[in-house]
């Protein structure tokens, strides 16, 4: 049997780190490059500074193994596709490597981008590599070798991080009639083997292969494949020590399978699924067990005493127990330091990225030097945990009693056919009605007004006047274009979740808590720390103003309870189902107020419905039960004549298709443009009988599709959905596009609808 490589074991590390910059420097630099305002050299200088500062901070904090190659201009799966020579042939005409990379990510006028979808059950999106018959895997290691050299040149104990071959293929997509990508696994082993030798030659002592797919049910053969692949990779004579990282759940049978290979280290997520039973895997003896006891996905301070108890149970099960985050800190903000508005109690409960690194170092020190060496830190942790438990903001008996009463009486609407008849009589819409999802471009005037209000340069009345002017222009634009159901454009909203969080009790909105959603898109998730309630109406004033400007229906726009949870940092001291119902009650009250104000169409967005779906099938039914229940609680307070819409994002919908039907929304809009309407076959198969709008163009690309292209998409949709139930819309909100792109695209979309209506 191949023997493990003997390298100095590490004791304190993290799985990965963010790359956007503490002040979103990379976002600004890449967007400047795309717009032609920033040169290549300026972009690369920003990237180099971010890498250097990140590595230096991690090493200075006390990590004895620092992840590198976690920097990305856009996405780590796209980086891996470049590494393996697996970019789609359609980007080959772009001669420049960086521009070719961005063409695959964003598309161009002539090139469609790669499909985008959620990274497991997180709010990060990855680009889906396409594996076709012509795909030939070849190694292109320039990026990882250059970053390794950079880090070693700084004296950093660098550990390159690379998506592992099993995860890469299981998350890729077959195209052009090719078989399942995982069938190509044997072809990847020589490429990864070559990479190992080059990394060793470049000075790498350790390499990390990320294999989160091993905690899922994506392939029943994954454990056996992992054993075979990593046994083969360990046979490379000239290689670094190999650390295989699993995260986002329990690796189950994959853990002993990996442990039977000669890999030197295995990482487990002890926050999201794995437990101390991993200590019972005898093959771990002689290896490093990397224990993910510090939560890399949520913002709550680690209970150091509990974590040390877990670590104590693991000691002796492996040659070394190293302390780590449960996953990359990509998913949490950089640091608590800029959050000057936090009250002392709430601050004491939290840990962002920098604080989590310190927690890792403290725990590793406790293992090395004994608990007395970190007695002050343990006492501080104990006090914070106790403070949180007794804070009165965490329990509102009145809200809990209302939820119990509504759930007991049944949160359901009337018969769908009766609702449709009532809504048709009220709305008088044409066949194939056109609409948009909600948001319109956030113009410079909007951003200036928001900044001026925040700085105290204008008062609330002036801010409202400016936002009303934006709404007036958006309504006028939609009427000129000929859309049938309008939206107010959401100029007053900084984010579809944060806007509501700022108005709901039980939330705290951060000042600088940015995390990457995809590419240059950053979000600032609010912190849901206590029981949720709605002190006052949140949207009625804006929507009724918009409705006063037109005779066409204007949609009320709300975010659904599951999405608010998915895109927030949620309290971890009670079941998610209970928290979802509290948010749902607040949304329910808002829908009733909108209806009372005369709004006939209300959209309750659930783009993240699938995002919280547990990775193991055995756990999914219970989640879908309470997620659907929360949506129905939020939407069942209105009459049959009020049309409820919902919107769903970036998903492999087949896994939740029954739940989509169970939501019982009158109209469901779905992101289907990048996946070529595939979801409609799934809906058709289950007899989905309500309205559906399967996104006729992809708003995440600057490309403006032609009217004929969208008409073709509509004709394809009509093969699965009858005309009386088909809606015409973009596949998502338009906030991230500019006005010219939106105007041209919507003009073509309306023209496409008219062409198809005319037959």
From Swiss-Prot:
GO terms for molecular function: 5-methyltetrahydropteroyltriglutamate-homocysteine S-methyltransferase activity; zinc ion binding. Pfam families: Meth_synt_1, Meth_synt_2. InterPro entries: Cbl-indep_Met_Synth_N (IPR013215), Cobalamin-indep_Met_synthase (IPR006276), Met_Synth_C/arc (IPR002629), UROD/MetE-like_sf (IPR038071). Its EC number is 2.1.1.14. 5-methyltetrahydropteroyltri-L-glutamate binds at residues 24-27, 118, 521-522, 567, 611. L-methionine binds at residues 437-439, 490, 605. Binds 1 zinc ion per subunit. One of its GO terms (cellular component) is plasma membrane. Residues 1-16 have a biased composition (Polar residues). Its cofactor is Zn(2+). The active site is at 700 (proton donor). L-homocysteine binds at residues 437-439, 490, 605. Pathway: Amino-acid biosynthesis; L-methionine biosynthesis via de novo pathway; L-methionine from L-homocysteine (MetE route): step 1/1. Zn(2+) binds at residues 647, 649, 671, 732. Residues 1-22 are annotated as: Disordered. The keyword Iron-sulfur does not apply. Keywords: Amino-acid biosynthesis, Metal-binding, Methionine biosynthesis, Methyltransferase, Repeat, Transferase, Zinc. GO terms for biological process: methionine biosynthetic process; methylation. Catalyzes the transfer of a methyl group from 5-methyltetrahydrofolate to homocysteine resulting in methionine formation. HAMAP family: Meth_synth (MF_00172). Belongs to the vitamin-B12 independent methionine synthase family. This is 5-methyltetrahydropteroyltriglutamate--homocysteine methyltransferase. It comes from Mycobacterium tuberculosis (strain ATCC 25618 / H37Rv). The lineage of its organism: Bacteria, Bacillati, Actinomycetota, Actinomycetes, Mycobacteriales.
């Amino acid at each position: 049997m191949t023997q493990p490589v003997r390298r100095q074991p590490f004791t304190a590390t993290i799985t990965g780190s963010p790359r956007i910059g503490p002040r979103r420097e990379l976002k600004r630099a890449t967007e400047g490059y795309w717009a032609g305002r920033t040169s290549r050299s300026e972009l690369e200088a920003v990237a180099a500074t971010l890498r250097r500062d990140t590595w230096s901070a991690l090493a200075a904090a006390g990590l004895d193994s620092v992840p590198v190659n976690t920097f990305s201009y856009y996405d780590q799966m796209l980086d891996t596709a470049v590494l393996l020579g697996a970019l789609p042939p359609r980007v080959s005409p772009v001669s420049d490597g960086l521009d070719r990379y961005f063409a695959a990510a964003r598309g161009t006028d002539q090139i469609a981008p790669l499909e985008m979808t959620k990274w497991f059950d997180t709010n990060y999106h990855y680009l889906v590599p396409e594996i076709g018959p012509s795909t030939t895997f070849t190694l292109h290691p320039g990026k990882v070798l250059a970053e390794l050299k950079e880090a070693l040149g700084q004296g950093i104990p660098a550990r390159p991080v690379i998506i592992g071959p099993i995860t890469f293929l299981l998350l890729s997509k077959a195209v052009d009639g090719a078989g399942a990508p995982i069938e190509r696994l044997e072809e990847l082993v020589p490429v990864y083997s070559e990479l190992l030798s080059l990394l060793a030659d470049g000075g790498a002592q350790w390499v990390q292969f990320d294999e989160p797919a091993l905690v899922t049910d994506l392939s029943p053969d994954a454990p056996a494949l992992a054993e075979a692949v990593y046994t083969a990779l360990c046979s490379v004579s000239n290689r670094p020590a190999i650390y295989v990282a699993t995260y986002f759940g329990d690796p189950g049978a994959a853990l002993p399978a990996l442990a039977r290979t000669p890999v030197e280290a295995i990482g487990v997520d002890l926050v999201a699924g794995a437990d101390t039973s991993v200590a019972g895997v005898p093959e771990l003896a002689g290896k490093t067990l990397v224990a993910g006891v510090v939560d890399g996905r949520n913002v709550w301070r680690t209970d150091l005493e509990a974590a040390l108890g877990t670590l104590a149970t693991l000691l002796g099960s492996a040659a070394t127990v190293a302390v780590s985050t449960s996953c990359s800190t990509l998913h949490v903000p950089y640091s608590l330091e800029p959050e000057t508005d936090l009250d002392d109690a709430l601050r004491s409960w939290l840990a962002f990225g920098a604080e989590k690194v310190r927690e890792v170092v403290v725990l590793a020190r406790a293992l090395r030097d004994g608990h007395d060496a970190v007695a002050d830190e343990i006492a501080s942790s104990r006090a914070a945990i106790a403070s949180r438990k007794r804070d009165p903001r965490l329990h509102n008996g009145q809200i809990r009693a209302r939820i119990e009463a509504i759930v007991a009486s049944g949160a359901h609407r009337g018969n769908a056919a009766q609702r449709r008849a009532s809504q048709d009589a009220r709305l008088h819409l044409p066949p194939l009605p056109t609409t948009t999802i909600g948001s319109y471009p956030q113009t410079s005037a909007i951003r200036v007004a928001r900044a001026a209000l925040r700085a105290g340069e204008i008062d609330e009345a002036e801010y409202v006047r400016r936002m009303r002017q934006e709404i007036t222009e958006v309504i006028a634009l939609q009427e000129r274009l000929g859309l049938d159901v309008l939206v107010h454009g959401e100029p007053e909203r900084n984010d579809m979740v944060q806007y509501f969080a700022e108005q709901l009790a039980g939330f705290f909105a951060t000042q600088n808590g940015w995390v990457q959603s995809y590419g240059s898109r950053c979000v600032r998730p609010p912190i849901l720390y206590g029981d949720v309630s709605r002190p006052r109406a949140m949207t009625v004033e804006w929507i009724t103003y918009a409705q006063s400007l037109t005779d066409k229906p204007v949609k009320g726009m709300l975010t659904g309870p599951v999405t608010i949870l998915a895109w927030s940092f949620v309290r971890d001291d009670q079941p998610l189902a209970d928290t979802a119902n509290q948010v749902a009650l607040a949304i329910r009250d808002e829908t009733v107020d909108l209806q009372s104000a005369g709004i006939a169409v209300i959209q309750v967005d659930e783009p993240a419905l699938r995002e919280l779906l547990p990775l193991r099938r055995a756990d999914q039914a219970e989640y879908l039960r309470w997620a659907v229940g929360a949506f129905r609680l939020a939407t069942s307070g209105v009459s049959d004549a009020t049309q409820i819409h919902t919107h769903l994002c970036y998903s492999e919908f087949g896994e939740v298709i029954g739940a989509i039907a169970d939501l019982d929304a009158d109209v469901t809009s779905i992101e289907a443009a990048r996946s070529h309407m595939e979801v409609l076959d799934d809906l058709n198969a289950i007899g989905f009988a309500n309205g559906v709008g399967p996104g006729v163009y992809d708003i995440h690309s600057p490309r403006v599709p032609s009217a004929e292209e969208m008409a073709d998409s509509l004709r394809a949709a009509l093969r699965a959905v009858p005309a009386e139930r088909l809606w015409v819309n973009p596949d998502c909100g338009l906030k991230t596009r500019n006005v010219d792109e939106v105007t041209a695209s919507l003009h073509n979309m309306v023209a496409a609808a008219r062409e198809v209506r005319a037959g």
